[in-house]
Amino acid sequence: MAIPKAHYSLAVLVLLFVVVSSSQKVCNPECKAKEPFHCDNTHAFNRSGFPKNFTFGAATSAYQIEGAAHRALNGWDYFTHRYPEKVPDRSSADLACDSYDLYKDDVKLLKRMNVQAYRLSIAWSRVLPKGRLTGGVDENGITYYNNLINELKANGIEPYVTIFHWDVPQTLEDEYGGFLSTRIVEDYTNYAELLFQRFGDRVKFWITLNQPLSLALKGYGNGSYPPGRCTGCELGGDSGVEPYTVAHNQLLAHAKTVSLYRKRYQKFQGGKIGTTLIGRWFVPLNEFSELDKAAAKRAFDFFVGWFLDPLVYGKYPTIMREMVGDRLPEFTPEESALVKGSLDFLGLNYYVSQYATDAPPPTQPNAITDARVTLGFYRNGSPIGVVASSFVYYPPGFRQILNYIKDNYKNPLTYITENGVADLDLGNVTLATALADNGRIQNHCSHLSCLKCAMKDGCNVAGYFAWSLMDNYEFGNGYTLRFGMNWVNFTNPADRKEKASGKWFSKFLAK
């Protein structure tokens, strides 16, 4: 998960975890017109109100849980060791949850939670140390993922596999700049085909990319993620051009991989393939201001439409073309046809909604400010939703974005591939406090309530994955944020304990 730090300008969040106002309104399980902001009865709410074939799962990613043992370096390894000051606790994921050694324990946690599915990712450099097929396949890495997938299947848990979750092999960064170069499209497609060949007999759900926006903006817009490039960054960069190049190349890699899967593997393997986008909703700061209404629409187009428009319509949003000009790459007619419709399903990661207000043009081109929008979580000092120690979350936005996608993007088959909230842990949180995470129960319960409402509205949603199965290394925040439904001791990762939220989710699914 990527914490929604300021992409434009945001209010600073320093309040305590979950402050709930009874005057605020959102969906409840009955989906009435006016409902309390929190779940009235978390014990009574359960999965019985969802379709029988609806999938519930939990999610993680390779870099955040596996540890670095027995794999080649990726961009995050290099970045966190070269620039430890970029992470609040100066940490890396060298050990993390040690899931490379403890994957059977991971599956036990999943089994205890009663989930039907597990969203995981493959570490590119664990199976292809040089990043490309010509550099050789690491059969030990293949064996690791075979063992994990087999363990999941043996326990009745369906694997949903993310092919790329921001961990570019460092060899490809060194050789040609990773996703800055079109050369990565072929290497990525070959890597994906290797996964189809080795795991496709058991994996029936493939996710090509995780939040391509985050890699583009944070890796190349402000340099807070690897490879740490931006205008004025030590490693160089151009914040007004490179994010658009990287986004474009990710879309091409996705589209060519989907085309390959459909032509060579889908018919006899019987799987589906899609991608996961960030799902953020935007509310006009002044609901009566036409400028703010337009700003909220622009924010959506620059955050979500940037990727969803090409995937559904084969072209970038018109407003982006008008405002970004020739800095925004063009699809050739052949590329447009390839990208258009390259989704069997849409994955959506939803965490927050924000207020949007019109902003003046930036002083210099930058993909982070090109939309000319100022974003925040507060209106006249009042938060948009529930104030947590990590961010402010707004469950009604969940329903609103799903309905907007239904109405404007042909109502695609959708899986909620991430949703959750973090607790801040600066080393001063007792174990008892960490395990009593009632705020997380409210977060999941309220979002599931709004999801149920959205489905009654006709939104084509087929699954929900909680982020996260367990506490892990949070990109850009190290170990200072804990998203897990299970607690992990990061000095001894075999020490895991079920949180109150994990117990709640297990009971929610058992009913």
Swiss-Prot record:
Glycans are attached at N46, N53, N222, N428, N489. Pfam families: Glyco_hydro_1. It catalyses: a thioglucoside + H2O = a sugar + a thiol; Hydrolysis of terminal, non-reducing beta-D-glucosyl residues with release of beta-D-glucose. Specifically expressed in roots. GO terms for biological process: carbohydrate metabolic process. The keyword Glycoprotein applies. The active site is at E418. Gene3D superfamilies: Glycosidases. A beta-D-glucoside binds at Q64, H165, N210, Q211, Y351, E418, W467, E474, F475, F483. It seems that the absence of a catalytic proton donor in plant myrosinases is not impairing the hydrolysis of glucosinolates. Hydrolyzes sinigrin and, with lower efficiency, p-nitrophenyl beta-D-glucoside. This is Myrosinase 5. The lineage of its organism: Eukaryota, Viridiplantae, Streptophyta, Embryophyta, Tracheophyta. The gene is TGG5.
